[in-house]
Regions:
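Active-site and donor-binding regions of nucleotide-sugar-utilizing enzymes
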Residues: 15, 19-212, 216-217, 231, ...
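Donor-nucleotide binding loops and adjacent catalytic segments primarily
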Residues: 68, 74, 81-82, 88, ...
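Acidic donor-binding loop of glycosyltransferase active sites
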Residues: 118-122, 290-321
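A short alpha->beta transition loop at the rim of the catalytic pocket in nucleotide-sugar-dependent
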Residues: 142, 311, 333
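A short, well-ordered alpha-helix in the C-terminal region of glycosyltransferases
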Residues: 379-393
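C-terminal alpha-helical cap of glycosyltransferases
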Residues: 394-407
Length: 407
């Protein structure tokens, strides 16, 4: 089978890359250890529901479902697997799962060994996870498997003339819970009909996060009462080159930056661009934070709570590979600004359509938009309301999934 030949080449390439790349090395090491983790931690007498997410973003999409199932069906145990270190390293101690490990690559040998050890009762693959051998083996063993929050586009291989064998992979799913009607139409065009439009579980997730947002006294002290606060989340250098110059020239606003990469060189680079008083979160005190105009979040795990302190938000990545999570900001009822690389994200298109999210092409667009928000309180309020309403109006995917899955 061509797919297995490609997988074999891919595995060889990954092992070679691991010699030079620490992140890939972590992944390879984790995959090798996965079988030992399963042997040690899996209870042969228990029924496991297996959730697989490529990385952290996909995990957050599946998380509401995991936690609802735990609450409603406590008799089941949860196995959570990851493909990427960026997911595993952050959530390896996640209390909502009984076992957390990497997913070994999709070779026939790995697949058989993994499923033998894990013996899942049911499986849930989040968003873009379509591993041919895992799905085929689950179907062969009559283990129910669901696709959650998936979204499909005409450009994907399943809908190309040369994608014949890949089309059959989608037929291994007992049901696909998709984000939009276009996905249903595309799937129907290749004979996949067990589908339901439920939307995106991330809407449910960000509403839950919002209701449990951490109170951060240092951020509260930094914000004060006199000036509007601009929160830039998951920013990269091209993003920072747009909003930092504006901040430098506008003393009527404060700035919180939570960069995507928080290594020392990037933090120093950011500080070098700033022309106003700045403090790092890990070095902040009740005294010095009040004197700063910019607060740099140099640790992980706070961003989803920090957006609550802003009047305007910026979500980074849109001048690189793709934007990060816009819903984390929108849920707090504040306008969201982002760069042009957002076309693959349905929620970004929805935010733009409702005038709660705003795409910029560069610094001129950003400056014009910020001038409008800072000078027109009614415009700022309406944009924020639009963003918050968009999130609330699109929640409910979790309930639709729970009504369909039989446990």
């Amino acid at each position: 089978m061509i797919y297995n030949f490609v997988i074999a080449l891919y595995i060889s390439a990954v092992h070679l890359a691991a010699l030079f790349n620490k992140k890939v090395a972590k992944m390879v090491k984790g995959e090798k250890e996965a079988f030992a983790v399963l042997k040690k931690q899996i209870d042969p007498q228990a029924k496991y529901l297996w959730f697989h997410a490529a990385s952290l973003g996909e995990f957050e999409q599946g998380r509401p479902l995991i936690e609802q199932i735990r609450k409603q069906y406590p008799q089941y145990k949860i196995l959570q697997t990851f493909f990427s270190p960026s997911g595993y390293e952050v959530r390896k101690d996640y209390k909502g799962a009984d076992v957390v490990c990497y997913l070994p690559l999709d070779s026939p040998r790995n697949v058989k060994k993994f499923i033998d050890l894990a013996h899942p009762y049911m499986a849930f693959f989040i968003k873009y996870e379509f591993w041919c051998n895992y799905l085929s083996e689950l179907k062969r063993r009559n283990i129910p498997v669901y696709s959650v929050s998936s979204i499909f586009r005409p450009q994907q291989i399943f809908f190309r003339w040369y994608g014949g064998s890949y089309k059959n992979v989608l037929k291994c799913f007992d049901h696909l819970f998709v984000q939009n009607e276009e996905s249903v139409r595309l799937l129907e065009s290749i004979g996949v009909t067990r589908t339901t439009v439920v939307g995106d579980t991330r809407f449910d997730r960000v509403l839950e996060i919002c209701s449990q947002a951490k109170e951060l006294p240092l951020v509260e002290s930094f914000k004060g009462n006199n000036r509007k606060t601009f929160v830039a989340g998951s920013s990269w250098a091209p993003d920072e080159d747009i909003f930092i110059p504006y901040f430098n020239e506008h003393p009527e606003m404060k700035l919180i930056i939570a960069p995507h990469v928080i290594d020392e060189s990037h933090l120093r680079e950011i500080i070098g661009k700033l022309k106003r008083p700045v403090v790092r979160y890990t070095q902040a005190t009740e005294e010095n934070v009040k004197q700063a105009d910019c607060l740099i979040i140099d640790c992980f795990g706070l961003l989803s709570s920090i957006y609550r302190y802003g009047e305007i938000s910026y979500v980074g990545g849109g001048f690189g590979v793709s934007i990060h999570n816009t819903l984390e900001a929108a849920v707090y009822g504040i306008p969201v600004i982002f760069g042009p690389n957002n076309y693959k994200f349905l929620e970004a298109q929805g935010l733009k359509a409702c005038q709660g999210g705003f795409e910029i092409q560069g610094k001129e667009d950003f400056d014009r938009l910020m001038n409008k928000f800072l000078s027109d309180e009614a415009c700022l309020h309406e944009a924020g309301k639009n963003a918050g309403d968009y999130v609330r109006n699109n929640a409910g995917a979790l309930e639709k999934i729970m009504n369909t899955v039989s446990l």
